[in-house]
Amino acid sequence: MTSTFRHVALIGKYHAPSASAPSENASNALERIADFLRRQGCEVVLDTQSALHAGLTDYPTLDVDGLGRHCDLGLVVGGDGTMLGVSRHLAQYGTPLIGVNQGRLGFVTDIALEDFEATLTPMLQGEYEEDLRPLMCARVIRDGQCVFEALAMNDVVVNRGGTSGMVELRIEVGGRFVSNQRADGLIVATPTGSTAYALSAGGPMMHPSIPAWVMAPIAPHNLSNRPIVLSDANEVTIEVVAGRDVSANFDMQSLASLQHGDRILVSRAHHSVRFLHPKGWNYFATLRKKLGWNEGGA
């Protein structure tokens, strides 16, 4: 049968060039998947960097934004970190994404590499579950000017330096003062990010369909400062009141050396990420598999 998707972007996990050769496993995986897609009647276009580092020269290439403009499906081969970076770029184009897991846990890259042909064949023919995930937009305001802006799919984290003491942060939600908190830092996470850093800080796991965020302090001085679930319709403002070497992280994007008085404004982005999963996929099955629930049980 002919694929529902005509132009498919193939993006792989890659590293910066080094003296060593590119990973043979990564190269072989991309080549096998590209050949499979071509046999399904798809026009395959590789991300420029993926093709370069994997040594694949038989396919046309585009940068990530070019893929978003040209392709009607993105196939990401790697781990969740690879998917985080790609999804932030492609969300604005509405490009649906399928993740083939070549990492470890793989919460959003959920197709096993060894089973990709059997799993992808019906998906390419239109048999899939669609899953929308919200993005955060974060801006750093200094002296009334925006000095940094980024999107995040997992979380925004403000934290202290590795050798410094606690930071003091002033928190507002929807323009209303919440509290001044002294802690090692603060996490604002999406439902997608609720199973990442926020979970280790004691936050709850949130179903991805819930329009909410979790705000979780990291090692707070006052133990009554607990994680709280917020509506994602409200902007969260985090102001740096005191502390040395304070930094902010937006997924894997970092801004070091925040200054006293800097304000980090976190709001829901205009675009969401579109994930496609195999037919029958559900969130709770993912939790059982990735977190080891029911091991040894019925």
UniProtKB/Swiss-Prot annotation:
- EC number, UniProt record: 2.7.1.23
Q: Subcellular location, in the record's words?
A: Cytoplasm
* Chief location bin: cytoplasm
GO CC annotations on file:
cytoplasm
Q: Name the reaction it catalyses.
A: NAD(+) + ATP = ADP + NADP(+) + H(+)
Chain positions recorded as NAD(+) binding sites: 80-81, 154-155, 182, 184, 195-200, 219, 253
Question: Which cofactors must be present for this protein to function?
Answer: a divalent metal cation
- Keyword Cytoplasm carried by entry: yes
Q: Which GO terms describe its biological process?
A: NAD metabolic process; NADP biosynthetic process
Per UniProt, what is one GO molecular function of this protein?
Answer: metal ion binding
The superkingdom of the source organism is Bacteria
State the UniProt keywords alphabetically: ATP-binding, Cytoplasm, Kinase, NAD, NADP, Nucleotide-binding, Transferase
One Pfam family here:
NAD_kinase_C
Q: Which residues form the active site?
A: 80
Q: Indicate the family of this protein.
A: Belongs to the NAD kinase family.
Which function does this protein serve?
Answer: Involved in the regulation of the intracellular balance of NAD and NADP, and is a key enzyme in the biosynthesis of NADP. Catalyzes specifically the phosphorylation on 2'-hydroxyl of the adenosine moiety of NAD to yield NADP.
By what name is this protein known? Answer: NAD kinase
The species is Delftia acidovorans (strain DSM 14801 / SPH-1)
